[in-house]
């Protein structure tokens, strides 16, 4: 499917590529939002929280020193992504895992499509420049090319901003997971 899309992006005009890029950017943002929503749903679902000690965490929490508790908390933080990945194999977990996996796959596909569109824009511009050198272009198309170049630059900047925002949200989510792990760990007296 991606190969077909890449080949069609090379035959599109720069304006069509810009519109396709905008569409792909919107899909990428929507998929990123779905990932965050799915993660939020998992965190808000108490049935997914580990209230009983598993064999591996029981061994680390029964230690008398604080470092064992810290390592159990760190394992809980690292294990959150493992938890969502292991649920896809039918290992158990909430229904939110399939939503998270679907959103993640959708995000990866839309980013790949967006990159293909952005990579095709320079090729389209080169083809347009070649046409202009051969006398097939017009001054109007130069203005159009400049406008589309600005739009492509704007799209790239918007992607960068959205990626920074998604990274910040993921960092906040990690902090929240760490807090939840701390609240769930047994108190040592």
UniProtKB/Swiss-Prot annotation:
Where found, per UniProt?
Nucleus
What does the entry list under GO cellular component?
mediator complex
Going by the entry's taxonomy, the superkingdom of the source organism is recorded as: Eukaryota
Coiled-coil-forming residues are: 138-178
Cite the InterPro entries for this sequence: MED30
Which keywords has UniProt assigned to this entry?
Answer: Coiled coil, Nucleus, Transcription, Transcription regulation
Instruction: Determine if Coiled coil is one of this entry's keywords.
Output: yes
The record's family statement is: Belongs to the plant Mediator complex subunit 30 family.
Q: How does it assemble?
A: Component of the Mediator complex.
Purpose: Component of the Mediator complex, a coactivator involved in the regulated transcription of nearly all RNA polymerase II-dependent genes. Mediator functions as a bridge to convey information from gene-specific regulatory proteins to the basal RNA polymerase II transcription machinery. The Mediator complex, having a compact conformation in its free form, is recruited to promoters by direct interactions with regulatory proteins and serves for the assembly of a functional preinitiation complex with RNA polymerase II and the general transcription factors.
Under which name does UniProt file this protein?
Mediator of RNA polymerase II transcription subunit 30
What is the species of this protein? Arabidopsis thaliana (Mouse-ear cress)
């Amino acid at each position: 499917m991606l190969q077909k899309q890449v080949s069609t992006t090379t035959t599109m005009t720069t304006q069509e590529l810009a519109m396709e890029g905008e569409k792909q950017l919107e899909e990428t943002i929507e998929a990123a939002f779905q990932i965050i929503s799915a993660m939020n749903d998992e965190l808000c679902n108490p049935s997914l929280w580990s209230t009983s000690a598993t064999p591996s965490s029981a061994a680390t929490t029964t230690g008398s020193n604080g470092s064992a508790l810290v390592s159990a908390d760190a394992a809980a933080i690292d294990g959150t992504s493992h938890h969502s990945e292991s649920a896809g194999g039918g290992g158990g977990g909430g229904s939110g895992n399939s939503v998270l996996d679907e959103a993640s796959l959708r995000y990866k596909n839309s980013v790949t499509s967006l990159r293909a569109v952005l990579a095709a824009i320079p090729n389209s511009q080169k083809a347009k420049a070649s046409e202009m050198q051969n006398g097939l272009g017009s001054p109007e198309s130069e203005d159009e090319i400049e406008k589309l170049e600005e739009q492509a630059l704007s799209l790239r900047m918007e992607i960068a901003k959205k990626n920074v925002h998604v990274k910040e949200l993921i960092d906040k989510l990690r902090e929240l997971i760490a807090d939840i792990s701390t609240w769930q760990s047994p108190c040592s007296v």
